[in-house]
């Protein structure tokens, strides 16, 4: 028994040394301002929520998420070899593959330990608007499948009420043959400026990864004050597949500030501002 314990201890120490060496050999790019803070926010979120025992991890999209994958990769092959990583869309799929991590899908892993994703806006209750990249159907599936859903973003996404910073409207994924009727019904609900989202590098509408269309529907401030109610009302419209309002799902949110610090909010109402995180320290591997 003593010999077995010694062998296990040696193996654990060897794995820890391998992970530490992998981290030390990786050169961190020099960043400044909000970009440095976005990296710090992502690293802190990974260190606090992606534990070595977690085996199924959801990876979302957004400009802060690449730093999430970067930090996870720094945890080393000994930790990541047993893990599966489930993407919300093309961007996160490519991040997972390029980092040499194992690619999974939600069909195989309908229960996820933790999902980390970006957001277009987050209010004080951690309700989110998502879907600026037209991935919100898959993003919500992974968010709801996770035991813990965490958001990482920059300070421009940190608001007091939804619709005050993200002005493009609520993203709504719709069946292509139903978009005209959904637009009509949204306007009757109060979204006078609801529009079908058009492609920027192609003629015609944006087509989601699921082959559907996306509508952007701005609503008056009075309706945005109760995003849960608005979500339910939009979801009842025939032809609507998913709504980019994520209500009562997010547990924690990490924001990179323009001064290099991070702000951490929790669904319980706790707020930490001006947090400094040392990105040069090695992540936990045991």
From Swiss-Prot:
InterPro entries associated with the record: NagB/RpiA_transferase-like, Ribose5P_isomerase_type_A
GO cellular component: cytoplasm
Gene Ontology molecular function, alphabetical: ribose-5-phosphate isomerase activity
Protein location: Cytoplasm
Enzyme Commission (EC) number: 5.3.1.6
Keywords on record: Cytoplasm, Isomerase
Pathway note: Carbohydrate degradation; pentose phosphate pathway; D-ribose 5-phosphate from D-ribulose 5-phosphate (non-oxidative stage): step 1/1
Enzyme's top EC category: isomerase
Catalytic activity: aldehydo-D-ribose 5-phosphate = D-ribulose 5-phosphate
Chief subcellular location: cytoplasm
Family: Belongs to the ribose 5-phosphate isomerase family.
NCBIfam families: PRK00702.1, rpiA
Protein name: Ribose-5-phosphate isomerase
Taxonomic lineage: Eukaryota, Fungi, Dikarya, Basidiomycota, Ustilaginomycotina
């Amino acid at each position: 028994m003593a010999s077995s314990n010694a062998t296990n201890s040696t193996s654990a120490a060897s794995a820890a040394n391998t992970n530490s060496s992998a981290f030390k050999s990786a050169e961190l790019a020099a960043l400044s301002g909000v970009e440095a803070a976005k990296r710090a926010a992502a690293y802190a979120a990974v260190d606090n929520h992606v534990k070595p025992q977690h085996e199924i991890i959801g990876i979302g999209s957004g400009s802060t998420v690449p730093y999430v994958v970067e930090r996870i990769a720094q945890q080393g092959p000994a930790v990541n070899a047993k893990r599966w990583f489930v993407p919300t869309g093309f961007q996160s799929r490519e991040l997972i593959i390029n980092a040499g991590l194992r690619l999974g899908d939600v069909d195989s892993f309908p229960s996820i330990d933790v999902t980390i994703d970006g957001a277009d806006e987050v209010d004080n209750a951690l309700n989110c608007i998502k879907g600026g990249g037209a991935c919100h159907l898959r993003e919500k599936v992974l968010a709801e499948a996770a035991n813990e859903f965490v958001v990482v973003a920059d300070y421009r996404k940190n608001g007091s009420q939804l619709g005050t910073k993200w002005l493009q409207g609520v993203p709504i994924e719709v069946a292509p043959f139903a978009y005209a009727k959904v637009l009509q019904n949204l306007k009757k609900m109060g979204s006078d400026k609801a529009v079908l989202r058009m492609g920027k590098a192609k003629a015609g509408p944006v087509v989601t990864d699921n082959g559907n269309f996306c509508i952007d529907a701005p609503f008056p401030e009075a309706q945005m004050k109760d995003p849960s109610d608005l979500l339910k009302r939009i979801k009842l419209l025939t032809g609507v597949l998913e709504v980019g309002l994520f209500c009562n799902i997010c547990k924690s949110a990490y924001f990179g500030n323009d001064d290099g610090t991070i702000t951490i909010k929790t669904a319980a109402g706790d707020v930490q501002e001006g947090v400094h995180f040392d990105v040069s320290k090695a992540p936990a591997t045991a």
